[in-house]
Structure formats: C-alpha cells, structure tokens
Amino acid sequence: MTATLQQRKSANVWEQFCEWITSTNNRLYIGWFGVLMIPTLLAATTCFIIAFIAAPPVDIDGIREPVAGSLIYGNNIISGAVVPSSNAIGLHFYPIWEAASLDEWLYNGGPYQLVIFHFLTGVFCYLGREWELSYRLGMRPWICLAFSAPVAAATAVFLIYPIGQGSFSDGMPLGISGTFNFMIVFQAEHNILMHPFHMLGVAGVFGGSLFSAMHGSLVTSSLVRETTENESQNYGYKFGQEEETYNIVAAHGYFGRLIFQYASFNNSRQLHFFLAAWPVIGIWFTALGVSTMAFNLNGFNFNQSIIDSQGRVINTWADIINRANLGMEVMHERNAHNFPLDLAAGEVAPVALTAPAING
C-alpha cells in the first residue's frame, strides 16, 4: 500500500505569497515593510492631491475663521496647502468616523491628520524596507541609518512639535508658503536661529552640499582617460568594471596641495563614510532641536545683554532679531490672541490705587 501526502492548497498559496514578497528578483522589492508602506503612502498621496485641489476652507485657529488652502478656492501652487486640523480638535485623533458629517470633518481639517499619519507610517516602513532589502542582499545596514535623518525631521515637524504645543493646528502645513509660514512663526516663538542644534543642522546641509560638490568635481577632474576627444567621457566606464574609473592618488595630490595634506582623504572608504555622516548627523541635530523646542526649550536669549554705565541698553544683533521676532509674533494668528505671549509676559506696571482729587 502506498500513502501520498499532499499539502493543503491554502498553505501552498501562502508560501508562494511569502516567497514573492521577500524575493530580491522582483523589479521592485516589496518586503514585509512594503506590505504596509504601499497602502499607507498611496492613501496619503491620494488624500493630499484631492485636498490640495478641492478641500474647503479649514478653521485652523478654532475661532470660526476658515483658511482656504486648495486650488479650487483661489490658491495657486505656491500659496496652496493642505491646512492643518483645527485648534478646536487639539491633539484628538480625528478620523472621518469621529465627525458628525463629512462637511464637519473637512471644516475641522480632518484630511491633514489622514495625510500625516499615513505619510509618517509610510516613511517609517520605507526606512524598514531599506534595512530589509539590505539584509536580504547581505549588505551592511547603513543606508536606512542615513535615511533616518529626514525621517526624524519629518517626525519632528508633523508629530513631536504638535504634541509639545498641544494641537495639530501647530503642525507644518502641507504646502510651499505654508512651510514658510511655519518657519517664520517657529522663529518668532522659539528663536530657532539662535539654537545651537539648528546651527549644526545648517552646517550639516550646507557642508554636505559643499563636500558633495567638491567630491564630484575632484572625481570628474581625475577620470582615467578611456575615450578619444570625439566621444563622451562617460563611454569610458562600463558598469561592473573592476578597474577604478578615476585616479584617487591624483585627486588626493591635487586637494592636498590646494589646502594642506591632511585635509585630503587617502582612503576611499573613510571619505564616503564622511560624506554620508556629515549631513546625516547635522539633520539629526536639527530634528532634535525642533523636538526640544516643541516643549518650549528655546534658542539662546541674548536680548539687552549689554548696557552702559548709566544702565542704558546698547543694542546688539540679538536685539534686532528679538524686535523682528516680536513683529512676526504679533502678526500671526492676529485674531486668536488678545495679548501675544512675549508682550503679555513683561513686568507689571504700577498703577494708582486711588483716583486723584479733581479741584473745581
């Protein structure tokens, strides 16, 4: 008697699905993180496009003064945005089913929460997917570590800052001029330009751009000649070739003489680690700075630091910045505040306790 064992079809289908999901032979790697990444990013993108084009005005400050952000309501690509959810909602989770009607959900800025939560979930999964693909291919895991810098920055402005300030209405609007408005108000309320972590972020971004340009120009200037004058130098490289396509010794010698010897890397691995680490660490610091300023641990305050022998203030650039901050602060959300915080926080002015006698 012969016995045959046959696997259940459902288990076989599941195994095939798992194999397909984790296969590195697919044109685009999916992975288990991709199973969550794809629908969340599609949802965020779809809602963003629809809201940017057609969303009705949103009562962002919670004072019944809706702000229009969509193209249909008169904006252009520069001025348009998905407006953050209402200050009346605060930090409450506000999905569609929490609103009494779709009109109410739109009026209170529900699409903003839908977009940022799906977007953040999607980019977290994209980071995980980078690690997953590196793992499958036997690569080192530093690609996802580099991507963690922009992920941290997005998390800071869309999630940590609203949590610290107590309302998603303080999150960054999803648009060009909305981003600039966020930056201006952030400076007015937190003096971010005087925060050391923001300074490190500026050094990271500008320094990274400089180093990238320096590296690219040095490599391009020291290519090994493989072509004639009549054809593109790009034809001198064949994908997968074993030989170096540029002369690192020549590049090292040039740059070492241009600056000084030890300003130039003589190790290609150290060089490329430096090119990756510099901007990543800078952006990490900026994200950390925004996350601390979310809880009002603000930039340095050097206002009225210098006074003369008579006690009069000698203005410095810090005082000029402070004056600009006050101007920006009193102008933003101008109908939501009776007394802007900085102006209302001064010392109490003495007043007369009794009315003066009036003769006559």
Curated annotation (Swiss-Prot):
Q: Which reaction does it catalyse?
A: 2 a plastoquinone + 4 hnu + 2 H2O = 2 a plastoquinol + O2
Q: What EC number(s) is this enzyme filed under?
A: 1.10.3.9
Q: Where along the chain is chlorophyll a PD1 bound? A: H198
How does it get modified after it is made?
A: Tyr-161 forms a radical intermediate that is referred to as redox-active TyrZ, YZ or Y-Z. C-terminally processed by CtpA; processing is essential to allow assembly of the oxygen-evolving complex and thus photosynthetic growth.
Chain sites annotated for binding Fe cation: H215, H272
Looking up CDD domains in the UniProt record yields: Photosystem-II_D1
Residue span(s) of the pro-peptide: 345-360
Binding residue positions for a quinone: H215, S264, F265
- Classify the protein's membrane topology as the record does: Multi-pass membrane protein
One example of the protein's molecular function in GO is: oxidoreductase activity, acting on diphenols and related substances as donors, oxygen as acceptor
Q: Where is this site: Tyrosine radical intermediate?
A: Y161
| Functional note | Photosystem II (PSII) is a light-driven water:plastoquinone oxidoreductase that uses light energy to abstract electrons from H(2)O, generating O(2) and a proton gradient subsequently used for ATP formation. It consists of a core antenna complex that captures photons, and an electron transfer chain that converts photonic excitation into a charge separation. The D1/D2 (PsbA/PsbD) reaction center heterodimer binds P680, the primary electron donor of PSII as well as several subsequent electron acceptors.
Additional facts recorded: Cyanobacteria usually contain more than 2 copies of the psbA gene. 2 of the reaction center chlorophylls (ChlD1 and ChlD2) are entirely coordinated by water.
Q: From the Swiss-Prot or TrEMBL record, give the protein name.
A: Photosystem II protein D1 2
Please tell me the species this chain comes from: Trichormus variabilis (strain ATCC 29413 / PCC 7937) (Anabaena variabilis)
